[in-house]
């Protein structure tokens, strides 16, 4: 099994994010999204707009995403 991983904050999920994740999933059999924890998002004041749990829920609803895991890597 080939596992692919993407990292990001995915705040305000948009079509570009979805296309990126679909392309990543097409490169393997299982896609893990490493989702940046709220306190490590460095997109400016007031970000993230959506809390980690909300962003994770949206990502998990995408057919191309197999797993969402927290990460401390800023994005």
Predicted feature residues:
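Nucleotidyltransferase catalytic core that binds NTPs
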Residues: 1-75
